[in-house]
UniProtKB/Swiss-Prot annotation:
Residue runs in coiled coils: none
Protein name (Swiss-Prot/TrEMBL): Regulatory protein RecX
InterPro entries given in the database record: WH-like_DNA-bd_sf
Family under the similarity heading: Belongs to the RecX family.
Length: 31
């Protein structure tokens, strides 16, 4: 079976963006 590469890439991008947003919120709270 072949895994849908597009789906995994999209999921990885979403996780990366969510992590960036979380870190940004954390930094904003620290300031």
């Amino acid at each position: 079976m072949r895994q849908p590469i597009e789906k995994s890439l999209r999921q990885r991008a979403l996780e990366y963006l969510s992590k960036r947003e979380y870190s940004a919120v954390e930094l904003a709270q620290k300031l």
